[in-house]
From Swiss-Prot:
This is Integrator complex subunit 3 homolog. Belongs to the Integrator subunit 3 family. Belongs to the multiprotein complex Integrator, at least composed of IntS1, IntS2, IntS3, IntS4, omd/IntS5, IntS6, defl/IntS7, IntS8, IntS9, IntS10, IntS11, IntS12, asun/IntS13, IntS14 and IntS15. The core complex associates with protein phosphatase 2A subunits mts/PP2A and Pp2A-29B, to form the Integrator-PP2A (INTAC) complex. The keyword Cytoplasm applies. The keyword Nucleus applies. Residues 946-955 have a biased composition (Low complexity). The modification Phosphoserine is found at residues 1056-1057, 1061-1062. Coiled coil: none annotated. It is found in: Nucleus; Cytoplasm.
Length: 1086
């Protein structure tokens, strides 16, 4: 009855900050805000300004109360618009951390709880944000970024539009502040270009025009910040290309890129840059991202329908929301990369989620954009730097759908064939190479066994199969082709004409009014499904992808729409000079029709090099060219020299067997570095002085167009030093890492990034050479390579048992050091996600380096039995060779105790009990005793910060849990001597006396061990604990015997799982041991 008023009071309380229903439970964030507000009100309610300021100043002096006060004041600002200005003034006066607590909690609130905030709180967030920006509060950009994430795409609700417009007003008002933060500029540009697409409704015309004016202005003024947005920014720009301001931007991007920024070379530069995951992430609501992660990581394949239905109802219920599908597909492809364990499990795969998103889309425009999002990375794929996980979903959707859902596979295949040819005709050859690279790597990595079941399926119509044969003839079996034409990607042949120039094509873009216009939501009535593309004349055009019939059956390659919107291919682009093998993909340039005159200082040597194409003439030219000042060469002459030099260097490299067949024969070694490219290395090796600008420019171009240059230089230095040392053994040659640094500077990248990239390419090219160079790499690049996780992973993924043996030999001989003891723990942490075999190899190498346990023992609490079996098994073997110490035991007992116990801890305690039982018992007992206050007031001391931090882990419950599970593991009395030692008995007594009833009940069997000893040793020692036990009278003796019988029954239930166990013998043995130990402690006077 007394609780009823309290219940009614809590029920009547209505939160001013959150919208709550009767079934909602408050979580930690909501409770924290409301609790802080209530506590603050209790202290300042009814006070005047001066008294309140004094109280707030006093509160601010204490860390915990300062944080609570800051949250309470933030609550007031978000819920009381009238008091907000005064509260903000109070915060600025008393805050002693630059408002970092307020900013951090506001960021958390926006990221986690924005959807539950009241309408008034949402308005106040904008007010607070404006004040923060106005006064340039630190880290306010974090709040802004999370607010941008809440401005969802495909949502034209009043709440969302209010947020979008008010954020825009802040950005316009404080433009100067905004431009000082490049990342924020990028996020805003990316977000608003995406949002503009959704605001095509005439009712939103004023908002849309404001967005367009601001976004275009920001893009043009800060284009150097926009360039890193990469290819997905181009994809978004296509969707708004018909808006006049964006159309003019497209003209400048295509025809006058230097007007936007001096370093901008055109649209292909953007298309080659992979868009950062953070920008793809910022276009998804945080709540939506969490739901998507749950779907892709926790839902079993076959059980996903109800989750998908919920997702459909929640996020795809309006016509505008269809545009969201492209954002989701790009996010899934580029951000959600499942581990190997997840790929092998029965969790719903990414391709199934993407297939659902595409097949459930009823809007033809959104459907076409969703397909473009699926294949977008294919068009520009470079296997040397792009991730296969970005192209895997596309092929798997088609491959797994061909049997039961052939219309999905047919639609996607038709789209892929057409987009390859029509996305951007000027660069069709490069895009076709990207798609070829994708399919080639898919087969090389066995993502699917082969393409024949897909490309030659009888479920595809005849026109589509012909289209596939025309576009992917290399991947279609000869039996499926009537007459095989010349391969589309032949191997490179010798180039007879050594004079080249860049193709220039300055055509005028003409915009046809009957073309598709996503920005205005209008399109050609003759085409049902269309996608915005760039044709050969750089016009924004359309391409038909499919025609939907009334019964939802799909018709592909319809003759009526075959030619609609398909631009004529430029007749000049008919040769195949651009087709190179997969590992040598570098596009060539068109030849000059006339020769360019060069300065006399280099003309003769250059012509000789071009004619003879050998290393000697190349080095002669380099001697003349190295000191040539920049003023001597015009830009056209420099381009002429660089283009021809690069092509000759690339053409003279062997296509196969680029490395020596023998690692000892001098003839083979010398021949393998006799090509002109190695002449450049030799020249740099002998001339380390700073070169003139033309030489540096040429070196940069060579590095850009020949990606193998890095690992070929490492190979050259190994061979060159080996050969020179053999010629003159008294003066051994050494690696000159300074030469490699020159190459890194030419690529404008850090040496660590270059080294990792080059070693990765080398391992993929030739594992044997990679392992041969490995000791030299770790010796010469010691500061970079040692403890480098990326290089270590490259090594582990390629070694077999013999390779591991050879590496261990090198380590044992002192020729190779892969680890330093100091930071090796980070390497092991990183390796916990590696494949099992890779982890076993890693631990072999760790053992070879004699890494002491103290260097890695901090990992003990982090390792989980279910997820890290490899690391735990090796750690246990290391522990077997160690004596138990206070620190090791503390870390081990800090491990989380599962319901069934921790077999790792139990195993370690068992084998230590065999050799160090008494020491182990004392260490655990002292650790357990330290968790409780001392019984003697004279021994109470104020703990220091360091001691309190270390003593807080493990907790008393953790220690008791591990002791309990260890007790359960003991069978027939083996290993239980741990509990009979004096210190352990006292520790258990102390634990029992300081435990609450639930703990006593939970560990009753464990405490019973101390209880038994209490009757025979501890509890009957008199006042001082030193006197001899008094003899018992007959009555007491009977009681005592009864107690022993009860204890015996307890012991039997604790230790026996077997009817025939000899618990009586164990009890007698244990008691006799305790008696012997007690006898030693009796003073002589007794």
């Amino acid at each position: 009855m007394e609780q009823q008023p309290h219940q009614s009071k809590s029920a009547s309380y209505i939160s001013k900050l959150f919208v709550c229903t009767s079934v909602d439970c408050k979580d930690e964030i909501e409770e924290k805000f409301e609790r802080s507000f209530v506590n603050l009100q209790q202290q300042i309610s009814g006070l005047g300004d001066k008294e309140m300021h004094d109280i707030l100043s006093q509160i601010a002096c204490k860390d915990k109360q300062h944080d609570e006060m800051s949250i309470g004041l933030l609550y007031i600002m978000l819920t009381d618009p009238i008091m907000a200005p005064k509260t903000y003034r109070d915060i600025t006066l008393v805050s002693r951390d630059g408002m970092s607590v307020i900013v951090a909690n506001l960021t958390l609130l926006v990221a986690e709880k924005y959807s539950k905030l009241t309408e008034g709180a949402c308005r106040q967030i904008i007010w607070v944000l404006r004040e923060f920006v106005k006064h340039q509060v630190l880290s306010v950009e974090n709040v802004i970024w999370n607010c941008l994430r809440q401005a969802g795409g495909g949502d034209v609700s009043h709440k969302n539009l209010y947020l979008v417009e008010n954020l825009l007003d802040i950005f316009i008002e404080y433009r100067n502040w905004l431009e000082t933060n490049p990342f924020l500029v990028q996020s805003i540009v990316y977000s608003y270009v995406r949002l503009i697409e959704d605001h095509s409704n005439p009712a939103l015309a004023s908002l849309r025009q404001k967005e367009v004016n601001f976004t275009i202005s920001l893009i043009r003024d800060r284009f150097q910040d926009v360039i890193p947005l990469g290819r997905d920014f181009v994809r978004l720009l296509q969707n708004v290309a018909r808006i006049p301001e964006f159309e003019q931007l497209w003209r400048d991007v295509l025809y006058n890129p230097k007007s936007l920024h001096p370093t901008f070379n055109g649209i292909w530069q953007l298309l080659q840059i992979r868009t950062s995951r953070r920008f793809l992430q910022c276009r998804l609501l945080p709540e939506m991202e969490r739901k998507l992660h749950f779907l892709a990581s926790s839902v079993k394949f076959g059980n996903q329908k109800r989750y998908q239905d919920w997702f459909q109802d929640k996020y795809f219920s309006t016509p505008e929301s269809h545009s969201l599908r492209s954002d989701l597909i790009r996010f899934i492809i580029n951000v959600i990369h499942p581990t190997n364990d997840m790929l092998c499990s029965d969790i719903i795969p990414r391709w199934a989620i993407i297939g659902w998103l595409i097949s459930s889309c009823t809007n033809p425009i959104a459907s076409a954009n969703a397909k473009l999002s699926l294949f977008y990375d294919w068009l520009f794929f470079d296997p040397t730097k792009d991730n296969i996980m970005n192209i895997e979903p596309g092929i798997l959707v088609m491959y797994h759908s061909i049997r039961n859902h052939p219309f999905v596979s047919s639609t996607l295949l038709d789209f892929l064939c057409r987009i390859t040819k029509n996305f951007y005709v000027k660069y069709e050859d490069k895009i076709r190479m990207g798609v070829y690279n994708s399919l080639k790597l898919i087969l090389d990595k066995q993502v699917i066994p082969n393409l024949q079941p897909l490309f030659e399926s009888p479920k595809l119509d005849r026109e589509l199969r012909n289209l596939i044969r025309d576009n992917f003839r290399e991947f279609v079996s000869p039996a499926a082709t009537n007459s095989l034409s010349q391969p589309l990607y032949p191997t490179i042949c010798s180039i007879q004409a050594p004079i080249f120039k860049k193709e220039t094509d300055q055509r005028i873009m003409q915009c046809s009014q009957d073309h598709f216009e996503i920005g205005e939501a209008t399109f050609n009535a003759n085409s049902d499904t269309i996608v915005s593309l760039l044709d050969g004349e750089n016009k924004i055009v359309v391409i038909p992808t499919e025609t939907l019939t009334t019964d939802n059956e799909v018709v592909f390659s319809d003759e009526d729409v075959e030619g609609v919107g398909r631009p004529n291919k430029n007749e000049e682009n008919t040769d195949d000079d651009d087709d190179l093998p997969l590992s040598k993909v570098r596009l060539k340039e068109k030849p000059f029709t006339e020769k360019i005159e060069l300065p006399q200082t280099i003309a003769e040597s250059f012509e000789t090099f071009v004619a003879k194409r050998n290393s000697f003439t190349w080095e002669s030219f380099l001697k003349d060219f190295r000191t040539l000042p920049a003023c001597t060469l015009e830009e056209g002459q420099l381009n002429y020299v660089i283009s021809n030099a690069v092509l000759v260097l690339r053409d003279t490299l062997p296509q196969n067997h680029i490395f020596s067949e023998s690692k000892t024969d001098e003839k083979f070694l010398a021949k393998s570095i006799s090509y002109p490219l190695y002449g450049l290395f030799r020249f740099l090796y002998e001339n380390e002085d700073k070169s003139k600008k033309p030489f540096q420019t040429m070196l940069s171009e060579i590095c850009e167009r020949i990606p193998e240059i890095g690992y070929l230089l490492l190979y050259f230095m190994k061979i060159h030093c080996k050969l020179q040392t053999r010629k003159n053994s008294q003066h051994p040659y050494q690696f000159k890492t300074s030469v490699y640094r020159q190459i890194c500077e030419a690529t404008d990248d850090k040496i660590v990034n270059c080294l990792v990239r080059d070693l990765d390419l080398l391992e993929k090219e030739n594992t044997a050479i990679y392992l041969w160079l490995l000791p030299d790499i770790y010796r010469e690049f010691k500061s970079i390579a040692i403890n480098n996780n990326e290089i270590l992973r490259i090594t582990l993924r390629c070694v077999d048992a013999k390779n591991v043996r050879d590496i261990i030999y090198s380590v044992a001989q002192g020729k190779l050091a892969i680890f330093k003891h100091d930071c090796i723990i980070e390497c092991i942490r990183e390796s916990l996600d590696y494949e099992t075999y890779e982890q076993f190899c890693l631990w072999q190498l760790i053992q070879a380096h004699d890494v002491p346990l103290k260097s890695i023992q901090d990992l003990l609490p982090e390792l989980e039995a279910a997820n890290h079996p490899e690391a735990l098994s090796h750690m246990l073997l290391l522990l077997k060779n160690e004596e138990p110490t206070n620190e090791i035991i503390r870390l081990m007992l800090s491990r989380e105790a599962k319901a069934r116990g921790d077999s790792f801890v139990t195993s370690a305690l068992r084998f230590w009990c065999q050799r160090y039982e008494e020491k182990l018992s004392e260490i655990i007992a002292s650790l357990l005793t330290s968790k409780y206050p001392s019984s003697s007031p004279n021994k109470r001391k104020r703990p220091t910060k360091s001691s309190s931090a270390s003593s807080s882990i493990p907790s008393a419950d953790q220690v008791l849990n591990h002791l309990e599970h260890y007790r359960r593991s003991c069978r027939h009395g083996t290993g239980t001597g741990l509990y009979v030692h004096d210190m352990m008995q006292r520790a258990l007594q102390s634990a029992y006396s300081h435990s609450n009833d639930s703990t006593k009940k939970q560990f009753s069997d464990l405490f019973a061990l101390a209880a038994e000893d209490e009757t025979s040793a501890v509890g009957r020692r008199g006042g001082s604990g030193r006197g001899r036990k008094q003899p018992l009278n007959k009555k007491d003796s009977n009681i005592h015997n009864t107690g022993n019988k009860k204890n015996s029954e307890i012991l039997k239930t604790v230790y026996s799982s077997d009817d025939n166990s000899s618990e009586e013998d164990w009890s007698k043995h244990k008691i006799s041991q305790a008696a012997k130990k007690r006898k030693k402690n009796i003073p002589d006077s007794e």
